[in-house]
Amino acid sequence: MTVEQKFGLFSAEIKEADPLAASEASQPKPCPPEVTPHYIWIDFLVQRFEIAKYCSSDQVEIFSSLLQRSMSLNIGRAKGSMNRHVAAIGPRFKLLTLGLSLLHADVVPNATIRNVLREKIYSTAFDYFSCPPKFPTQGEKRLREDISIMIKFWTAMFSDKKYLTASQLVPPADIGDLLEQLVEENTGSLSGPAKDFYQRGFDFFNKITNVSAVIKPYPKGDERKKACLSALSEVTVQPGCSLPSNPEAIVLDVDYKSGTPMQSAAKAPYLAKFKVKRCGVSELEKEGLRCRSDSEDECSTQEADGQKISWQAAIFKLGDDCRQKSYWGARMPTDRILRLPASQDMLALQIIDLFKNIFQLVGLDLFVFPYRVVATAPGCGVIECIPDCTSRDQLGRQTDFGMYDYFTRQYGDESTLAFQQARYNFIRSMAAYSLLLFLLQIKDRHNGNIMLDKKGHIIHIDFGFMFESSPGGNLGWEPDIKLTDEMVMIMGGKMEATPFKWFMEMCVQATWLCGEPGPYMDVVVSLVTIMLDTGLPCFRGQTIKLLKHRFSPNMTEREAANFIMKVIQSCFLSNRSRTYNMIQYYQNDIPY
């Protein structure tokens, strides 16, 4: 019945979102079938067969018929006889092992039935490997059981004197550079409301960005601040428009008092806040097409749903090369100011966003925040500000205590539920960013580039040094992972503490996920390879070779775990992290 009704093991596969193509309507998350009933049922069948093969030929015939109906000779078709999700691997191969046991017991007299059943068993086994590999979503106990089942199937298959090999070929992504041509073709084909929507959006954004050019001639200080507020007050909100850094929300209003010039005298970036209504890309397009540039009344952007309305901060900049310097502005109480956009930052954030989608897809409870950086033209761009965040640098300027003291004052002592939840958030974000710091070799990790949000997550920003570049003339002084004493204190104070063991366990899980046994290493390597010809300073000839080595390819699970554990141990309370913080304090007045 479960075969005909497509339940459990025989259910149709739910297509999971590709981490490389995640969208509002297609969020990456695991979609395993419910196979627990089949686990129980097949266990019963295995136990029953051990009795039936000695005493009941009728029951053996029923078993043979059941197996024949449950399996198929088809391999790799769009609709397989069984679900190919990794969560269904246990019951699938347990059923196949039962089939081999029936053949080996020599209780099926008909040779034709035996041969067909044997072929169906092998075809069903091959069929599982006809789809791209996936990372396990099962719990630890169930995963161990599934691995044990696979070993038993291999043993049974080996005794059957049949050898199966499978070649899994993942074709490279077909990536071309036809973007400019596509943009010209698309914009040239616009007319009517669509063209008005396009022109209205770019006109609004150009006016917002041009404030940077207006304030550039003014000296830093009160004069530039006044010029910024004056220029911002002349910007009128266009109906149905969005920010490039936040295309899922309609801009309702501008906080004309929020204009804040950054510290850079030459580039003149500034921060502004906008009231936005989050509605999704599809709804925004509908709203934009309903609006007319000469009539805001026709645009249905009523502020009916208060939960969808919020204030969003962003940084705008109009100037020349935006790659050479970092910009830090007046320290905001709720939103943090990030460095200006660059191709290198965008590459790092693309990879971080990819890992975020991968973590969601495989059900790994890790946290990263890939804030958006959009380069709109050479030297021009907009950056999404991280809400409800404070930098470790800002924390040091406002108070005289470290991160651990901040946690105890903010969330209570270690026995409180609030502290434990914040610590858990800290650990799962530390594990994710530690893996990324190691894989991408992200450097310049001073306290100005480390953030804490109100939930306890740690967030890294500013990726000006990565791969084969590092501060101080590429000295490579900093360790692979930043694990300072205050970070360790939050995670228990020592490596033997339970919270720190959680951290190491999460790092090991994430490392094994990203290594060669999973399908994701090639995706990251390909993404970096595409950028090699850009001339970014982080590429010095050995980037891909060293990146592949850090992924610990060709290692067993145990070897990969030992590999990342040694990295963590070598970075634990490293003096190089502390001395780098001291250097930043004396050179750039960044507290530590």
Swiss-Prot record:
Biological process per Gene Ontology, one example term: phosphatidylinositol phosphate biosynthetic process
GO molecular function (one): kinase activity
Family assignment from sequence similarity: Belongs to the PI3/PI4-kinase family. Type III PI4K subfamily.
SMART domains according to UniProt: PI3Kc
Name assigned to this protein: Putative phosphatidylinositol 4-kinase alpha-like protein P2
Gene encoding the protein: PI4KAP2
Region: Pleckstrin homology (PH) domain conferring phosphoinositide binding specificity, residue numbers: 180-318
Region (G-loop): 281-287
Annotated region (Activation loop), positions in chain: 460-484
